Amino acid sequence: MDLSRINTWKSKQLKSFLSSKDAFKADINGHSVLYYAIADNNVRLVCTLLNAGALKNLLDNEFPLHQAATLEDTKIVKILLFSGMDDSQFDDKGNTALYYAVDSGNMQTVKLFVKKNWRLMFYGKTGWKTSFYHAVMLNDVSIVSYFLSEIPSPFDLAILLSCIHTTIKNGHVDMMILLLDYMTSTNTNSLLFIPDIKLAIDNKDIEMLQALFKYDINIYSVNLENVLLDDAEIAKMIIEKHVEYKSDSYTKDLDDVKNNKLDEIISKNEELRLMYVNCVRKNY
């Protein structure tokens, strides 16, 4: 039987069908009647099916809450949650319903889940399958910004650093700024601990580097000799930051600033020495 047109059935036909023993079995397409009701965003039919026992007869391959999370309207999600569906359940792909709300960009549905349980954004069978990381990967600044606003206390720094690494790799400047601003405002124990800049340097992503260099970024975390000799614009940015660190009373005595090969590299190259001198003059 094909149930794909059940949304057009008359009430008498629907009532007769729901009283049959096959009411909640899969049709020829492998779907249940509830699947089609949700797909059509038919709130009334969904309520009828729930009252008839649809949630007690779910197919193994169907996840109504996950499906409803892809809809722009939040009504069916609210109904399913009120009916007792588990918002932390993983589907057969290892994702939560919130993951699909994020995937669809449905901010109102995202808010609905997070207000109920903010920890859902970090639920996933792996760290890469969480709703938070998925929003970062999608470069959805609005959703990530909302997520950050709903976290009551700073979360795992390793997760945050991994997300920042991803934004640098993908060249997502606005997302990187959002995450770095959050990190610097909530983490006070890691001066010059911002993720390494190698990815941005390798990609010659000047826009990303310009954004990164506004923070206390660790310019000493990679081998900079080839960089300094290969790209004049990036070399100038690195030297300017180095001079800034050496002249700042807060950073000049840090081991990373004092014990590095940057000054030696600069001293051996006339062009780099000139850049350095100009930077020093500009700082005084």
Swiss-Prot record:
The lineage of its organism: Viruses, Varidnaviria, Bamfordvirae, Nucleocytoviricota, Pokkesviricetes. This is Interferon antagonist OPG039. Signal peptide: none annotated. The keyword Repeat applies. It comes from the Viruses. GO terms for biological process: symbiont-mediated suppression of host innate immune response; symbiont-mediated suppression of host NF-kappaB cascade. The keyword Repeat applies. Keywords: ANK repeat, Early protein, Host cytoplasm, Host nucleus, Host-virus interaction, Inhibition of host innate immune response by virus, Inhibition of host NF-kappa-B by virus, Repeat, Viral immunoevasion. InterPro entries: Ankyrin_rpt (IPR002110), Ankyrin_rpt-contain_sf (IPR036770). The gene is OPG039.
